[in-house]
Amino acid sequence: MGTIIESQATTVSKFAAGACFYQLGYTGIVLLLEVIAADFSNLNYRLLASFVPALPFIINTWISGNITTAVGTRWKWGIGMWAFILPLSCIPLGICLLHMRWLAHRDEETKKQLDQVENEWKIPRSWNQFWDVYVMDLFIWKLDFIGLFLSCVTFGCILVPFTLAGGLQRQWRTAHIIVPEVIGWVIALPLYIIWETKFARMPLTPWDLIKDRGILFALIIAFFINFIWYMQGDYMYTVLVVSVNETIKSATRITSLYSFVSVITGTILGVFIIKFRRTKPFIMFGASMWFLSFGLLVHFRGDTNSHSGIIGSLCLLGFGAGFFTYTTQASIQASAKTHEKLAVITALYLATYNIGSALGGAISGAIWTQVLPREISKRLKNETLSADAYGSPFTFIYQYPWGSPERVSVTQAYKHVQKILCIVGLCFCVPLLLCTFMLRNYRLADSVTLDEDEKEHGNYTTDGKYAEDDGYDSDTATMKQRFVRMFQ
């Protein structure tokens, strides 16, 4: 529905409405796939299973440029075609799930459990029962609609004005920028915290789980992954076309290299972890690779001499991501320990991941809109031409070919703003790496959760500390031993 609305939109507001529906469905699909992967795999196979839905990136990298070029300016068709491509691609999984449901009904014990669940959620005939069961119990309390609404208002009011303010300083003094910020910080955020801590029966943020450092720091890493990526990647396509003189096909493929390399690296790592059964060393290594990658991106950020450097930097960025993005998800799922908490922790991880995307997009958009117009105007010294270069860069590059004085000036402006974005990303790599030291390093068992494995082998203690079968005693350990243990 979202893609149909977007493809037929004639105004920004209609397109935004379609984007909301699209994002709602997309997030649901991603969460469902990750929960299925987690529910159908043992912990030591979890990383490999998590990468299965991402394997198409290996193909998408090389065909996306051709598709983008073929679509051209027919943007409505470019969006609308996914309204039937995506449902068709879901048919094999749907058939598989229906077949498994049919097999479950053939087993008497499983059939009784399914019938019991169906009876619990059977639609009541009376309105009063429907209101109590579906509206109040499910919608308000179990789905925590009020908490979800307050969180959306909070992040929307805080983040959107960063980009809407544009490159004009006077915009920050206008009501349509100030009022949303005040509502977000002063009203919505406190209300969200109060609701989640005092009134919500099943809060979006399970505070009892977040107290575990294995979960807390994994969530912080999830936030930083997309936040840092957006610093370099949000406007990379525009930089490649305008500032590096890449074609549409080439720019599309280059921006996809990150996903291509990360999926290949992560899949190979997933096979290796089946036997190695540890995640923390690989997460630390992958995060450290981002330092080197962003350092290269600070250097290679514009003109034709940066072509190979940007490709190498993005490949290195994807190489590092393959070691720690999905691996961190496997780590936090291991920290969840019980089957009941697995879906909650996975959903919380993906939610934090998307919050990082939102904040990263807002900050990168703010830097772009605040710095780039000023830099272009300073170099071109022509307000009309500067407005065209900033507002319609892809039209501008056809009017002023590569090597012309105007194009050179705009290229320098793009190089400057991309340097700022990459430096910001490089700075935030520091807390990202520090958080990897604070993760737990559980041994991934041949079971869906550590709770199941603990009942058979006793591999971890109930208070969340490591098993004490290697000589470590949490009751008699010295401060030095505790400090060293924190990073293991």
Task: State what each model feature region is.
Residues 78-95, 148-154, 180-188, 383, ...:
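Symmetry-related core transmembrane helices of the 12-TM Major Facilitator Superfamily/SLC fold
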Residues 4-6, 15, 65-74, 162, ...:
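Interfacial helix-cap and linker-helix signal at transmembrane-aqueous boundaries
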Residues 98, 395-488:
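Transmembrane-helix exit segments and adjacent C-terminal regions of multi-pass membrane proteins
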Residues 2-146:
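Helix-loop-helix hairpins in multi-pass membrane proteins, especially solute transporters
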